[in-house]
Regions:
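N-proximal, solvent-exposed amphipathic alpha-helical segments enriched in charged/polar residues
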Residues: 1-36
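Low-complexity, polar/amphipathic intrinsically disordered segments that mediate membrane, lipid-surface
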Residues: 2, 94-98
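Histidine (H) residue identity feature
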Residues: 18, 46-48, 60
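Short, non-transmembrane amphipathic alpha-helical segments
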Residues: 20-23, 59-81
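Short edge beta-strands and adjacent turn/loop segments
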Residues: 27-54, 89-94
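Flexible domain-boundary/linker segments
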Residues: 37, 41, 66, 80-83, ...
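A short amphipathic beta-strand at an alpha->beta junction
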Residues: 75-95
Length: 98
């Protein structure tokens, strides 16, 4: 195959969800990613992550951090034409003091 030829490949919705979930879990204050969905429309990746957060966390900052980490991972690994990521804080976890 010539290096200048176009090379077509696809990344499944399952793989996109896994990339976003793995990256999102790295954000401080995330206890779990409860659900996630992914779809690709005309080259634009649409993702939704539902997060269980640690009680007392800055929820706005946490959601932005999850969104940014997921976006950076998807951009680096997939290079989509466009990216739309939404984050919902679905639940809070009260964890015992350390």
């Amino acid at each position: 195959m010539d290096e200048e030829q176009d090379f077509a490949y696809a990344v499944s919705a399952k793989a996109l969800r896994h990339i976003a979930e793995t990256a999102g879990r790295q954000a401080s204050g995330v206890v779990a990613i409860r659900s996630r969905s992914a779809a690709v429309t005309d080259g634009v990746v649409h993702l939704h992550l539902a997060v269980r957060a640690r009680y007392g966390s800055d929820l706005h900052g946490l959601a932005l951090d999850v969104q940014q980490r997921a976006a950076e991972a998807i951009d680096a690994m997939v290079e989509p034409e466009g990216l739309d990521i939404s984050v919902t804080i679905e639940d809070l976890a009260v964890l015992p003091a350390e």
